[in-house]
Amino acid sequence: PGPCNCIETNVCICGTGCSGKCCRCGDACKCASGCGCSGCKVVCKCSGTCKCGCDCTGPTNCKCESGCSCK
């Protein structure tokens, strides 16, 4: 599986103006942090306002911002 697995449509489209930095929703989608990807749900969930890191591949290998926890 790709980073932050795309589990909905397997089709990921980055929002307008988003750069291709870090995989956010899966192999086909490379969106910058904070950018929306239509048709995707991120499997890895970080607590509060924390964001899932670039190396996230799911709940068992979840990497969040420093000081944040994952579920």
From Swiss-Prot:
<feature type="binding site">
    <location>
        <position position="62"/>
    </location>
    <ligand>
        <name>Cd(2+) 4</name>
    </ligand>
</feature>
<feature type="binding site">
    <location>
        <position position="35"/>
    </location>
    <ligand>
        <name>Cd(2+) 1</name>
    </ligand>
</feature>
<feature type="binding site">
    <location>
        <position position="56"/>
    </location>
    <ligand>
        <name>Cd(2+) 4</name>
    </ligand>
</feature>
<feature type="binding site">
    <location>
        <position position="68"/>
    </location>
    <ligand>
        <name>Cd(2+) 6</name>
    </ligand>
</feature>
<comment type="subunit">
    <text>Homodimer.</text>
</comment>
<feature type="binding site">
    <location>
        <position position="64"/>
    </location>
    <ligand>
        <name>Cd(2+) 6</name>
    </ligand>
</feature>
<feature type="binding site">
    <location>
        <position position="18"/>
    </location>
    <ligand>
        <name>Cd(2+) 2</name>
    </ligand>
</feature>
<feature type="binding site">
    <location>
        <position position="31"/>
    </location>
    <ligand>
        <name>Cd(2+) 1</name>
    </ligand>
</feature>
<feature type="binding site">
    <location>
        <position position="56"/>
    </location>
    <ligand>
        <name>Cd(2+) 5</name>
    </ligand>
</feature>
<feature type="binding site">
    <location>
        <position position="31"/>
    </location>
    <ligand>
        <name>Cd(2+) 3</name>
    </ligand>
</feature>
<dbReference type="GO" id="GO:0046872">
    <property type="term" value="F:metal ion binding"/>
</dbReference>
<feature type="binding site">
    <location>
        <position position="50"/>
    </location>
    <ligand>
        <name>Cd(2+) 5</name>
    </ligand>
</feature>
<feature type="binding site">
    <location>
        <position position="52"/>
    </location>
    <ligand>
        <name>Cd(2+) 6</name>
    </ligand>
</feature>
<feature type="binding site">
    <location>
        <position position="23"/>
    </location>
    <ligand>
        <name>Cd(2+) 2</name>
    </ligand>
</feature>
<dbReference type="InterPro" id="IPR001008">
    <property type="entry name" value="Metalthion_mollusc"/>
</dbReference>
<feature type="binding site">
    <location>
        <position position="70"/>
    </location>
    <ligand>
        <name>Cd(2+) 6</name>
    </ligand>
</feature>
<comment type="similarity">
    <text>Belongs to the metallothionein superfamily. Type 2 family.</text>
</comment>
<feature type="binding site">
    <location>
        <position position="14"/>
    </location>
    <ligand>
        <name>Cd(2+) 1</name>
    </ligand>
</feature>
<protein>
    <recommendedName>
        <fullName>Metallothionein 20-I isoforms A and B</fullName>
    </recommendedName>
</protein>
<feature type="binding site">
    <location>
        <position position="18"/>
    </location>
    <ligand>
        <name>Cd(2+) 1</name>
    </ligand>
</feature>
<feature type="binding site">
    <location>
        <position position="70"/>
    </location>
    <ligand>
        <name>Cd(2+) 4</name>
    </ligand>
</feature>
<comment type="function">
    <text>The metallothioneins are involved in the cellular sequestration of toxic metal ions.</text>
</comment>
<feature type="binding site">
    <location>
        <position position="44"/>
    </location>
    <ligand>
        <name>Cd(2+) 4</name>
    </ligand>
</feature>
<feature type="binding site">
    <location>
        <position position="46"/>
    </location>
    <ligand>
        <name>Cd(2+) 5</name>
    </ligand>
</feature>
<keyword id="KW-0480">Metal-thiolate cluster</keyword>
<keyword id="KW-0104">Cadmium</keyword>
<keyword id="KW-0479">Metal-binding</keyword>
<feature type="binding site">
    <location>
        <position position="40"/>
    </location>
    <ligand>
        <name>Cd(2+) 3</name>
    </ligand>
</feature>
<feature type="binding site">
    <location>
        <position position="37"/>
    </location>
    <ligand>
        <name>Cd(2+) 2</name>
    </ligand>
</feature>
<feature type="binding site">
    <location>
        <position position="25"/>
    </location>
    <ligand>
        <name>Cd(2+) 3</name>
    </ligand>
</feature>
<feature type="binding site">
    <location>
        <position position="52"/>
    </location>
    <ligand>
        <name>Cd(2+) 5</name>
    </ligand>
</feature>
<feature type="binding site">
    <location>
        <position position="40"/>
    </location>
    <ligand>
        <name>Cd(2+) 2</name>
    </ligand>
</feature>
<feature type="binding site">
    <location>
        <position position="29"/>
    </location>
    <ligand>
        <name>Cd(2+) 3</name>
    </ligand>
</feature>
